[in-house]
UniProtKB/Swiss-Prot annotation:
The lineage of its organism: Bacteria, Pseudomonadati, Pseudomonadota, Gammaproteobacteria, Enterobacterales. One of its GO terms (biological process) is L-histidine biosynthetic process. Its main location: cytoplasm. One of its GO terms (molecular function) is imidazoleglycerol-phosphate dehydratase activity. CDD domains: HAD_HisB-N, IGPD. This is Histidine biosynthesis bifunctional protein HisB. The active site is at residues 9, 11. Its EC number is 3.1.3.15, 4.2.1.19. In the N-terminal section; belongs to the histidinol-phosphatase family. In the C-terminal section; belongs to the imidazoleglycerol-phosphate dehydratase family. Zn(2+) binds at residues 93, 95, 101, 103. It is found in: Cytoplasm.
Length: 355
């Protein structure tokens, strides 16, 4: 799993910047920006790692002696640490603009190692700062930038923006047999649009979204002139991949789910979003098809989905009516998925520290 980073400016963003000389060189000049500590703690809990990056003009020269900088800076760091705020690294450019160095923001010299790491989640990493140079740094790094402002975009606003859940994924899967486009919104409900070319399968997929409490859009063009095998199988693979991506780092999810009765049927579903693909399936049908869906492909669908989603899935149903038996499986899976993907906290539900 890739890591989310926040590259945060110091003066004017974490602490106030004195308007007289723009230097925090005395203890009485040290003042934290409103709400910064609780919001940094909130962001850490949401899985972000923090990196401080700052330009300190002429640091170590007569105009800004190192000792004058060190006292307030060290006190600031001690306060952050005492409150649980941990910075992975503090990056400082000590040069003046006239020095034309290669490490001054918005140049990327100081952050080169992060850019070289494949593990950085660029889509969900940010530069946060109060100056245009901070936003330019974000552009140069190829990540997002947030322009801090006490009134327009303050720390509580930033914390809310970066921790608000809107888990989404878009997967496109093209083969010689099928062209599949899947979009999933785990934190939005209703409005699903599904078109696989297999009407009863569309109805079953809609049961997953409806009872799972999320929205999805699925468009499939498959080789139905042969049969429904590739369409059902590849849809399962694409949907499983989309669900896995949308779950992200899985922080705070319930992870497990169970259940469901339906008329004369009793369907049992147990789900663990474990990262370990496995399917146990037991269902018997009287006929080879329900509507235009082959009953033998139902197990194949769930096996494909569990494989790409990385879940342990147990499914079982008993009943008299094939339509009800099939529908009970999809409803049970959807209802169980609703429980498992629900967010209840901000910790990873695993003693191993990884899912």
């Amino acid at each position: 799993m890739s890591q989310k980073y926040l590259f945060i400016d110091r003066d004017g963003t974490l602490i106030s910047e004195p308007p007289s000389d723009f230097q925090v060189d005395r203890f009485d000049k040290l003042a934290f920006e409103p709400g910064v500590i609780p919001e940094l703690l909130r962001l850490q809990k949401a899985g972000y790692k923090l990196v401080m990056i700052t330009n300190q003009d002429g640091l170590g020269t007569q105009s800004f002696p190192q000792a004058d900088f060190d006292g307030p800076h060290n006190l600031m760091m001690q306060i952050f640490t005492s409150q649980g705020v941990q910075f992975d690294e503090v990056l400082i450019c000590p040069h003046l603009p006239a020095d034309e160095c290669d490490c001054r923001k918005p140049k990327v010299k100081l952050v080169e190692r992060y850019l070289a790491e494949q593990a950085m989640d660029r889509a969900n990493s940010y530069v946060i700062g109060d100056r245009a140079t901070d936003i330019q740094l974000a552009e140069n790094m190829g990540i997002n930038g947030l322009r801090y402002d006490r009134e327009i975009l303050n720390w509580p606003m930033i914390g809310e923006q970066l921790t608000k859940r809107d888990r989404y994924a878009h997967v496109v899967r093209n083969t010689k047999e099928t062209q599949i486009d899947v979009q999933v919104w785990l934190d939005r409900e209703g409005g699903s649009k599904i078109n696989t070319g297999v009407g009863f399968f569309d109805h079953m997929l809609d049961q997953i979204a409806t009872h799972g409490g999320f929205r999805m859009e699925i468009n499939v063009k498959g080789d139905l002139y042969i049969d429904d095998h590739h369409t059902v199988e590849d849809t399962g693979l694409a949907l499983g991949e989309a669900l896995k991506i949308a779950l992200g780092d899985k922080r705070g999810i319930c992870r497990f789910g169970f259940v469901l009765p339906m008329d004369e049927c009793l369907a049992r579903c147990a789900l663990d979003i474990s990262g370990r693909p496995h399917l146990e399936y037991k269902a018997e049908f009287t006929y080879q098809r329900v509507g235009d869906l082959s009953t033998e492909m139902i197990e194949h669908f769930f096996r494909s989905l569990s494989y790409t989603m990385g879940v342990t899935l147990h499914l079982k149903t008993k009943g008299k009516n094939d339509h009800h038996r099939v529908e009970s499986l999809f409803k049970a899976f959807g209802r169980t998925l609703r429980q498992a993907i629900r967010v209840e906290g901000d910790t990873l539900p695993s003693s191993k520290g990884v899912l």
